């Protein structure tokens, strides 16, 4: 008989982990919402790579990787970006902590399922770059929403995030920025939904 697993119950708690802990947010965001949005953008970047740039890409795999990209935060919490990326030593140490948390989560699964989930926590270097770009696009969208709500607290974060995306030199992310980002400035009527 298979023992009970807490893997899915623990994943459902992602909604209790707030993002942007050091910022005064007008629009609260949690890790579960962020992971969904990152998955949408990762999928989009994969489709852009395949359909616009004619390169081989498994967009669905990117979406799955993005769904789980912050799962370790259930155990580690959301470490603010300025701390996480303060220097290489700290970044590398935190990567080890995240990896250990991922391993702990996977160990909660029954053996029969574990192998199927391991690939969702293991990305190639190329996949990791695209998921990171999607992660940054999600952060940028949050910054834009905060600015639109009159919250100047996010202006610097918006500039830094734009610069970080540009410095990735990913044609897919550049295409998204050029062809999709402007729509986030529009209201519902301007988006033509009616």
Predicted regions and their residues:
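Alpha-helical, largely C-terminal catalytic domains
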Residues: 1-194
């Amino acid at each position: 008989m298979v023992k009970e697993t807490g893997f899915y119950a623990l994943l459902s708690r992602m909604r209790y982990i707030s993002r942007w802990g050091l910022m005064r947010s007008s629009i609260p965001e949690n890790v579960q919402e962020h992971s969904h949005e990152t998955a949408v953008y990762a999928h989009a970047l994969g489709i852009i790579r395949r359909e616009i740039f004619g390169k081989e890409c498994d967009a669905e795999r990117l979406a799955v990787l993005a769904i789980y990209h912050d799962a370790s935060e259930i155990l580690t919490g959301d470490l603010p970006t300025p701390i996480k990326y303060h220097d290489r030593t700290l970044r590398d140490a935190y990567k080890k902590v995240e990896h250990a948390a991922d391993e702990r989560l996977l160990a909660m699964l029954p053996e029969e399922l574990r192998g199927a989930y391991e690939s969702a926590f293991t990305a190639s270097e190329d996949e990791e770059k695209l998921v990171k770009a999607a992660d940054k696009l999600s952060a940028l969208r949050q910054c834009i929403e905060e600015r639109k709500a009159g919250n100047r607290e996010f202006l610097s974060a918006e500039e830094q995030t734009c610069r970080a995306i540009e410095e990735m030199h990913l044609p897919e992310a550049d295409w998204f920025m050029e062809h999709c980002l402007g729509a986030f400035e529009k209201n519902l009527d301007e988006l033509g939904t009616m």
